[in-house]
Amino acid sequence: MIRRVATCAALGLALAGQAQTASAAPFKPEGTPKVAMVLYGPRTDGGWSQAFEESRVRTEQALGIQIAVVEGIKESASAIRPAVELFIKRGYNVIIGTAFGYSDAFKELAEKYPKVAFLNGSGTTNGPNLESFYGRTYESHYLCGMAAGAVSKEGKLGFVAANPFGVVNWTINAYEMGARQINPKATTTAIYTGSWNDPVKERAAAEALAGQGIDVIGQHVDTPTPQIVAQEKGIHATGHHRDMKEFAPKASVCSLVWFWDRYLIPTIKKIGAGTWEPSPYGAFLSIKDGGPDIACCGADVPKEAADRVKAERQAIIDGKKVYGGPLADRDGKERVAAGATLSDADLWKMDWFVPGVVTQR
């Protein structure tokens, strides 16, 4: 699957170092918004696609509209084009995509249908009627790391990671930095599965981590398998994409949760009002402006620690930078100077780790 493989390179470089001073003219659709969503996977996958599905429902409820949906549309032009064009032929004029691999096809379709608005989650292409959007996931993983550090008895955390890309590495580092806010001696051992969605590999990685004496497992993969393994082993876990406590109620202490509706609702309103100005560099969303948030904290997290997580979340909303300096990597090299903040360009290409992180393949 290529859904997010190159997002770290393409969207990051599109955003990097460019002040968003140039904006397109407001987009004006023909008629009122009629919205459709194209899901990469099944709407009940327990992770990425289900998070979009739940956001779709919340958006419907908030706006009092119906949003049509088609699921299981893979990342090939031969699959994307007919699905989108069928919606357009039926009068839909706002199309929401959910995959990096839709990027090129969405760009072509946006140019072909200039009176249709296109939005694409984790996409990389933008235009006068097209905006890609993603989130600063490291903020939520920093907070989940704090919860993990609070429940760990040994200070040994694990992390089931998909691929060694910046978009994953920044979550691992943030997780460890958050944990050390609670336990300065905490460590995080990460195992890469090489896949975004492979329950077999995720189980193997989670079991390997548990076998090393790790007592909290985090994740940046799609399925809830690491949560399930954690509960089987009698240890704790933190989730990704959705609140995963439904799969492991005894293990789960925190999850990154996508609330795409916080972006979709105001954007669709602007489209309907004729005031939407899609960013030429895409939308890179923080907690404060509709990016991923958290479901926290589980009952096993001490109240004092839960209060600290809540306070840190508010601090991030108020402007605290997770990757603010001074910050050095695990080899002692300065990565962010005192008073500085890591640039978006450096975030997306992150290939280094903070002290306390151990990586395995």
Language model features by range: what are they?
Residues 8-18:
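Bacterial N-terminal signal peptides
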